Design a protein with these regions (language model features):
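C-terminal alpha-helical cap/extension of soluble enzyme domains
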Residues: 104, 113-238
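Alpha/beta enzyme core
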Residues: 1-80, 91-96, 100-108, 112, ...
Length: 238
């Protein structure tokens, strides 16, 4: 099992836990944490923020991952640095949600150029869950707008009702209770649920696919070394 740690505090809200301010990660503390715990990855606080309200023109303190990377490289330690709270919050998706009856205000993310500049500084994993949530929510609203007969569907009509009731929400988990069995088990009871889930999948692909290209990861999957379970066991026994 790969283990990811986190050091520092990101402002914003994640899974109903809110922090009003950020505490930047001290590079020396990060190196000590990595040495003592042996984590495979470490999420750091260097200017990102959870949620869709990160403020305009957020700037990342790239000197923090640079310092950590330089120290662990000199010590011969491998640890991937992780960027939490890094959603870009595409403005076209926010606009489309609001045009479809949503009410998302003051939603701004991290500029893609800032994230691209952080990658050479040691960032190896970038979390963009808010982007995925926005794209999925937009797609569900769009589906019910284009096919109004689905609003009274016995299986997914409840999803539409929640979309209408909670106009400022964009976390799909808020809207999924009527189809929670499908979400948890993969069981698809009818064509309406299958159609809705296809829109969910398309939203995930849209959000992630564009960033894979921006971050320079397109076409690199074959370069990842494949390891068997036995190989992994042997590696982590060292």
């Amino acid at each position: 099992v790969s283990v990811e740690g986190e050091l520092g505090v990101l402002g914003g809200q994640e899974d109903h836990v809110f922090a009003a301010t950020s505490t930047y990660t001290n590079p020396l503390d990060a190196v000590e944490f990595i040495q003592k715990t042996g984590v495979d990855a470490l999420a750091i606080s260097y200017g990102t923020q959870h949620g869709a309200n990160k403020g305009k023109d957020a700037k990342l303190r790239r000197e923090i991952p640079i310092a950590i990377k330089e120290c662990i490289n000199r010590l011969g330690i491998f640890c991937a640095l992780v960027s939490h709270g890094s959603s870009t919050v595409p403005q076209y998706i926010v606009k489309e949600i609001n045009d479809l009856g949503g009410d998302i205000q003051n939603a701004y993310g991290i500029n893609v150029d800032e994230l691209m500049a952080a990658i050479p500084c040691g960032i190896r994993k970038i979390n963009v869950d808010t982007d995925i949530r926005l794209a999925v929510t937009r797609n569900m609203k769009e589906l019910f707008a284009n096919q109004p007969e689905l609003r009274t569907s016995p299986s997914i009509g409840g999803v539409y009702a929640l979309l209408e009731e909670k106009k400022s929400a964009f976390d799909p988990r808020v809207f999924f209770p009527p189809i929670m069995d499908t979400v948890l088990t993969g069981n698809v009871p009818d064509d309406d649920v299958a159609l809705l889930m296809s829109r969910v999948e398309a939203g995930v692909k849209e959000a992630v696919g564009s960033l894979i290209v921006n971050f320079g990861s397109y076409g690199k999957a074959p370069l990842v070394e494949q390891k068997s379970l036995e190989d992994m066991i042997a590696f982590y026994k060292k």
